């Protein structure tokens, strides 16, 4: 009896020690436990693949981004049809642009439109001459997009732009005003970068376009509007434009910040329009600080 009790106690201790090990082993090999980590890994990988679309939702169907900007700046205008002097002064700008995914291009193409209006009150270098200058432009086209990095977007394309405007000089009695009308094809490039901003996402964007070719209305040197519209002397008023005789470019540098549930947009706009047509020179150099807002909308169909 006394010899069998220690032996039984030893066997019982071994059984208690081995039993948890035997019960824990099936838990490590159970199918439902081994699949869970794999599913978790697949979910993380899928999220990484969807990250570019989350950062740049314009590649998703039905997403449209609209932007309204108001600006104030300084203009430098020369129009030798009216005066050999440069007129300078403040100007105001209204800008509206939108972008959405195109119906073609397999998700890599976006449709881009831009509407701009400028109004300036100018004065001569001696401040004894005043002038008003106004211009409106409307452009539309496409951009091909590359997601070069989850935070970076590169787009290249172009658009067709229609522009028109006038300059009115208060000192001139015979020919006080000059009108403008043009059609052009403009290549465009856009670079955008998204970065964290107080636990949200902000966007910095740089876009530039330049006039490649087009047509433009302009009277020739010494040709009055009375001759054109009353006498029918319309020879030479339509000119083909190229970078050599009409170097024109536009540059936008914008930052969009999430503020109080909205998207505040601010930045700089440079609008440089120049021409040398029919023996006349003209330029309008506009430097503008812009402020506005951006909205991202989902189109329901």
Regions found by a protein language model. Give the residues of each.
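Short glycine/proline- and aromatic-enriched beta-strand/turn motifs that initiate or cap beta-hairpins
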Residues: 25-107, 298
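Short loop/turn motifs that connect adjacent beta-strands in outer-membrane beta-barrel proteins
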Residues: 57-64, 101-111, 145-155, 196-203, ...
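Transmembrane beta-strands of outer-membrane beta-barrel proteins
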Residues: 64-70, 108-114, 152-160, 185-187, ...
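Residues on the lipid-exposed face of transmembrane beta-strands in outer-membrane beta-barrel proteins
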Residues: 72, 94-102, 138-144, 158, ...
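Transmembrane beta-strands of outer-membrane beta-barrel pores
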Residues: 72-78, 116-122, 160-170, 195, ...
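Residues that define the transmembrane beta-barrel architecture of outer-membrane proteins
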Residues: 86-94, 130-138, 152, 177-187, ...
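Outer-membrane beta-barrel transmembrane domain signature
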Residues: 174-261
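Outer-membrane beta-barrel "beta-signal"
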Residues: 285-301
